Structure formats: C-alpha cells, structure tokens
Amino acid sequence: MSTPSSSLTTDESPASFILPDLVSHCPFPLRYHPKGDEVAKQTVHWLDSNCPDLTAKERKAMYGLQAGELTGYCYPYTTPERLRVVADFLNYLFHLDNISDGMMTRETAVLADVVMNALWFPEDYRPTKGQAAEELNPGKLARDFWSRCIPDCGPGTQARFKETFGSFFEAVNIQARARDEGVIPDLESYIDVRRDTSGCKPCWVLIEYALGIDLPDFVVEHPVIAALNQGTNDLVTWSNDIFSYNVEQSKGDTHNMIIILMEHHGHTLQSAVDYVGSLCQQTINTFCENKQQLPSWGPEIDDMVAKYVQGLEDWIVGSLHWSFQTRRYFGDEGQEIKQHRLVKLLTVAPPPPPPPPTPPPQSSDADTKKQKVKAQDGKGPVSDEEVWALVRAEQSKGSILESLFGFLTTSLSRIFFGYFFAYSH
C-alpha cells in the first residue's frame, strides 16, 4: 500500500496527519459472528429504550457507534445469547465513557458508587449512605445486563469482572481529578491510568464468559498470561489514541498519548503519531512472542487457555477494523481513510463562554477609611491605630449615634473576618 506524502504534516500547525498501517501489520484473521448484525440491532435498541433523556444528537452518535458490531468482531464464537449480554455491556461502557467526560471528581465518584452497587447487589437496589432512594439510570442498566450475565458466569470470572470494573472507575476518578486541575500527566503516569480507563480489562474477563470457561486464578496470574493481557490492552488502547485523536483534540480533551508526547517530549503531531504507531507494532510482535512462551497446565486447562488467547487475538484485529467502520472517529469517511490513511484535522471547538463576572463586594466603612489612609500617606499595610485615628477625626462630622454605629459595625466586621480567615486557612 502506498504511503501518502508526509509533506502535508510537517508544518508547525498541520492541517492533517497520516495514520500508521496497523491493519496490515496485524497477523490475525478477522472473524465476525453469524448473528452479529441481528444482535447489534437488539443491543442498540436496548440502550436507546432505556435512556429517555438522551438528546437527538446523542442518539445519532449511539447508532453511529456500532458497539454491537464491535462485539460481533471480538466475540465471534460465543452463543447468540451471550453475545447479546456482552454487546449490551460494550454499549453501556461507551455510554459511561460519554457521560463521564467532563464530570468533576465528585460526580465520577457518585457514578462509580451507583454502578458498583448494582454489581454487588444484583437482586435489588440497596442504597448506601448518601445514595438516592431512587436508583439512578446507570445503576439500572448495570443491574439489567449483570443479572443476565451471572447465571452463566463462573465465580472466578464474576469476581474478576467486579474487580476490574472497580479499577476502571478508580482510574476515571484520577482522570477527572487531572481534568479538574488542568494537568496533563507525564507519559508513565498516563499509561498506567489509561490501562484502566480504557475499560479493556473487564472486556477481557468477558472473553471467559462468552466462551463458557472460568480460568483458575493461578493461570490468570501467570506472568505470560498477564503479559498477553497487558499487551492486548496496550495495543487496543494506544491504537485508539491514534484513531480518536482528531475528535479529542477538537474538543480540547488531553487524555491521549499523542497530546502527551507533544506536550512533554517535544514531538510534532506526525512524529507523535508515528511513535505511538511503532509502539503498537512492537506490541503485536511481543504478543506473538509471548504466545510461544505459554506453559502447559494439562489438556483441560490448555484448551481453555488456547480459546482465551484466541479471544485476545480477536479483540486486537477486530478493534482495528471496527475503528474504521464506526462513525465515532472518522464519521462517514472511515473506509476511505482506511485505504489512504490521511486524516484532516477538525476545527477546534471554541471554549464555553466564561461565567458572568462577580460584582465586587461592598466595602465597609472601615475598609473605605483604610483606603483613604493608604492614599494619603502612600504606605503599605494600614495599622488599626491609623484607621481609628481617621475614624475619630471623622466622627466629629456626625452625630454621636452615627459614631457609635460606625464603631460597632467595624468591630463586628473585624471579629467576623478574623474568624473567617482563621478557619479558612
């Protein structure tokens, strides 16, 4: 495949960039579930019918996402019933990603409590301290798909799903805190958090559910299995950073490896994309090498491991191809961009208007007199003695009652502000 000219992307303010050819580098065959399209229609209707507050724009994006089709690529050998449960989760996961974008730290913590409550108490809603008496919609959706997942889900798989989904929310909270503070993390910190904000880990657990297996803990915790899991996570996550960069930069979102490389490591846009692309290619190579290092645990476990590893491969190749099919990243031009790999940058959306200015507080009589003293002598901080000297001088201009009122007002103000600053610091 020919490579577009890089001259289009060498300006300080580029108008476009070139994608790495990750699809051609991936050695795994692409598969699709025979019932994938049918289940995709069912799952998007499930989310649509259970989210009455979505706007018309949000509904259009939901249908353009094609999360059900992603499920068909990544879980091609499961039963239609289990495919539907996994598809509902993937649609739900993207929904959580959308509603958590822009949330403050406190709001993401509330969201996490609501969802994890549904996973730990799937039979009925049990509000904990501080939770609303009526269950919020994200909790209802989680309880719906999870209650359908449990009957065919092994105990180890259930435990791992709840653990990894909990880690997802912890990482989302870290991301929200960085967003609150306007911080762009360093590369190492970003990679560590991104492995959880991606939501990939619970998706890997659902490979077990989809295939009807329940891997022993000692297998899941084996270094080679852990390396295969992390390699798949990195490949899916980092390639997603490349594919989603254009949309994210247009919204001012900084939770992206491309932006971090430009911010902290002096990369241009194109060199950052090329660098992440090379990391993805190296990760695919390392995955294949690690696969050859798998030990044997006996025929029964080896068969489960082989199915599980193939599930990881299906995720790698499926997510790469789906990224050009969904409208989430490239709109209606995905298939064309898949061929020529040239991405034209979207216009950056203007920032929201600033809030109206807060009117200045009314100055007290004592404050006004302090300003007068400062203006008269040009000195720094004004002492209490100087203020009261001016007060006494001006008291002769008014009645005794006015003088007494001025004294009481100033004294009470001094007491109030003294306590205020003492306790606020």
Curated annotation (Swiss-Prot):
* Cofactor(s) for this UniProt protein: Mg(2+)
The record's section on Pfam families has: Terpene_syn_C_2
* Highest taxon listed in the record's lineage: Eukaryota
Task: Please list the residues that bind Mg(2+) 2.
Answer: 97, 101
Q: Which UniProt keywords apply?
A: Lyase, Magnesium, Metal-binding
Q: How is the cofactor bound?
A: Binds 3 Mg(2+) ions per subunit.
Positions occupied by motif DDXXD motif: 97-101
Can you state which reaction this protein catalyses? (2E,6E)-farnesyl diphosphate = alpha-muurolene + diphosphate; (2E,6E)-farnesyl diphosphate = gamma-muurolene + diphosphate; (2E,6E)-farnesyl diphosphate = (+)-(R)-germacrene A + diphosphate
Q: What's the record's remark on domains?
A: The Asp-Asp-Xaa-Xaa-Asp/Glu (DDXXD/E) motif is important for the catalytic activity, presumably through binding to Mg(2+).
The protein's name in its UniProt record: Alpha-muurolene synthase
Its organism's taxonomic lineage begins at: Eukaryota, Fungi, Dikarya, Basidiomycota, Agaricomycotina
Write the gene name.
COP3
